[in-house]
Regions:
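Active-site beta-loop-alpha junctions enriched in small/polar residues
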Residues: 16-22, 45-47, 79-81, 135-137, ...
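Gly/Pro-rich active-site loop or hairpin
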Residues: 53, 89, 93-104, 141, ...
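Hydrophobic faces of well-ordered beta-strands that scaffold small-molecule active sites
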Residues: 13-19, 38-42, 74-78, 130-132, ...
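N-terminal pre-domain/capping segments
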Residues: 1-107
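C-terminal helical cap(s) of enzyme catalytic domains, especially alpha/beta-barrels
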Residues: 292-305
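Short, charged alpha-helical segments
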Residues: 279, 283, 287, 291-294
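Acidic (Asp/Glu)-rich catalytic clusters
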Residues: 30-37, 55-75, 111-125, 151-159, ...
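Active-site acidic/histidine proton-transfer and metal-coordination neighborhood
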Residues: 68-69, 83-197
Length: 305
């Protein structure tokens, strides 16, 4: 994921990038705003460890003031190593106290992060949330149910929102299809459903072989299917990545826009994707290089002309 961002001009869509954490959340958000971003994502701590940085009340006030002054959507990404199902070999909440203790530790930090991000970005007409890879388990049915059971143990407050990200399907990874995401959602208790959203990653969905996003008609089918199975009101964020991995490879390999298998030949379907996201109020976050923001700025200029 990219670290440093040059100042850019104007992008007509609600797009930003994953950014490095700049000492405090307010500095991190401000760095994105000054680069012309309308959305950002960051790690509130190590991407490979569960201890999250604490955010002071002073910081909460500063960030909320920025959100009220500028059109910015705020997201964080929970550590890659999280697994709400427990582990590949041992389910949580299935009589293994050691595994349950580990999962409880993950949930404690996740609960803090999802509630603090909800406070930071929970401003009217702005989207926010914590993106998470739901988990892995060898028995898909049991794994999906256990993920929902873990979510049910979280005490959500206010505008807190947890975003389930689709996976590319490698190994025992879960949430590969809309149906699997819906199965998790359906098993979340009703009172907590409003705190659950979805993050769709274009590289993952292409790598799994669900939709060939290089084709315009597949973009429309993607939106139609999501609306039919889950509901577009639950689609909170788009991870906008090209794919180094071929279609249906079950591999997660991000590429810069125009440098992969999806948009290496043309950007026509990308324009359709961005247009539909704008129509439905879905912000997008890039996870590769700063140059992608320039690609989108240029693409927007050409589209206007």
């Amino acid at each position: 994921m990219n670290k440093d961002f040059p100042r850019i001009t104007y992008v007509q869509w609600d797009v930003g990038s994953h950014v490095s954490f700049k000492d405090t959340v307010s500095k991190t958000v401000w760095s994105a705003i000054t680069c012309g971003m309308l959305a950002l994502q960051f790690f509130l701590g190590s991407p490979m460890g569960f201890k999250r940085n604490r955010v002071s009340e002073e910081e909460v006030i500063k960030v909320r003031e920025l959100c009220e002054r500028f059109p910015i959507h705020i997201f964080s990404h929970y550590p890659y190593v999280s697994n709400l199902a427990g582990s590949v070999e041992s389910l949580a909440w299935n009589g293994d106290p050691t595994q349950d203790s580990k999962t409880n530790s993950i949930l404690k930090e996740l609960e803090y992060e999802v509630n603090i991000i909800g406070r930071l970005g929970g401003v009217e007409n702005k989207r926010s949330g914590v993106v998470i890879h739901p988990g892995n388990y060898k028995d898909r049915k049991k794994g999906l149910l256990t993920i929902a059971q873990s979510i049910n143990k979280i005490s959500f407050k206010g505008n807190a929102k947890l975003l389930l990200e689709n996976s590319a399907g490698s190994g025992c990874s879960l949430a590969t299809t809309f149906e699997e995401i819906k199965e998790i959602y359906d098993n979340v208790v009703d009172v907590k459903k409003k705190h659950i959203g979805v993050c769709i990653d274009t590289a993952h969905i292409y790598g799994y072989g669900l939709y060939d996003l290089s084709k315009e008609e597949e973009i429309y089918r993607l939106f139609e299917d999501f609306d039919k199975i889950i509901g577009l009101d639950k689609w909170t964020l788009l991870h906008l990545n090209d794919s180094l991995a071929p279609f249906g490879s079950k591999k997660d390999r991000h590429a810069e826009l125009g440098q992969g298998h999806i948009w290496g030949n043309n950007f026509k379907s990308l324009l359709t994707l961005l247009s539909l996201c704008k129509k439905h109020g879905i912000p997008a976050v890039l996870e590769t290089q700063p140059s992608d923001m320039f690609v989108l700025a240029q693409l927007g200029d050409e589209n206007l002309n």
